[in-house]
A protein has these predicted regions:
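Substrate-binding/catalytic cleft of secreted carbohydrate-active enzymes
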Residues: 1-195, 202-208
Length: 208
């Protein structure tokens, strides 16, 4: 893959793993994979999407031992979806054990487009929007975060998502439905990005 795609300008990072369990054999294999990646392409940084953190109350410490081998740490953080309630997320604080740049490689929640209800009712657009709202507050508080990639733009087919009447073999975490209809969370994320862009523009104007 690296040999095929290393001249593509769209490739920013090489990711060598996604949510791998923490044990010695994994650390040995992945560290060798990082070395091979750098041998094949010395011009790009190497990352991995991790989901191992130690927890101390509302504090999450990024201390996966494999994080010492990569250049940029990716974190898959599904607060409010795979753990906790949406309003827990804004109270979470994060620490990075080794000071490396961090990207939130996945975050989000599922919703069936057109399904409405209370903000605490799973699979509704309101619940997905609440997860995004509180996660975006959490991200604002993570000063060492250098980027995010919400999971995911559009619903897609998934044979592992059989829940009848809701999933029907689709992954429903998209900000858009499978037919491209925007869900409520899409507008929240757009406003977040617009706010970030305006803030950056103001910083640039100060430097000028």
């Amino acid at each position: 893959m690296i040999g095929r795609d290393k001249n593509r300008a769209a490739i920013v990072l090489w990711s060598v793993a996604n949510e791998t369990p923490n044990h010695d054999a994994r650390l040995s294999f992945l560290s060798r994979l990082v070395d091979k990646t750098r041998e094949l392409d010395s011009t790009r940084l190497v990352t991995a999407a991790l989901d191992t953190q130690s927890r101390q109350g509302n504090v999450r410490v990024i201390d996966d031992p494999f994080s010492t081998h990569v250049d940029v740490i990716g974190i898959n953080a599904y607060c409010g979806w795979y753990g906790g309630a949406p309003d827990d997320c804004a109270r979470w604080t994060w620490e990075s054990a080794n000071g490396k740049p961090v990207i939130i490689s996945e975050f989000g929640a599922g919703a069936l487009q057109g399904r409405h209800g209370a903000a605490n009712e799973r699979w509704t657009e309101e619940y997905q929007a609440a997860v995004y709202e509180h996660n975006l507050t959490m991200l604002d508080n993570m000063r060492f975060v250098r980027g995010t990639t919400p999971w995911i733009l559009k619903d897609f087919r998934s044979p592992r998502r059989p829940l009848p009447g809701i999933q029907d073999f689709w992954n429903r975490k998209g900000l858009l439905s499978d037919s491209g209809v925007r869900k409520q969370a899409w507008y929240l994320l757009r406003a977040f990005y617009e706010r970030k862009a305006l803030s950056q523009q103001r910083e640039n104007d100060k430097e000028d």
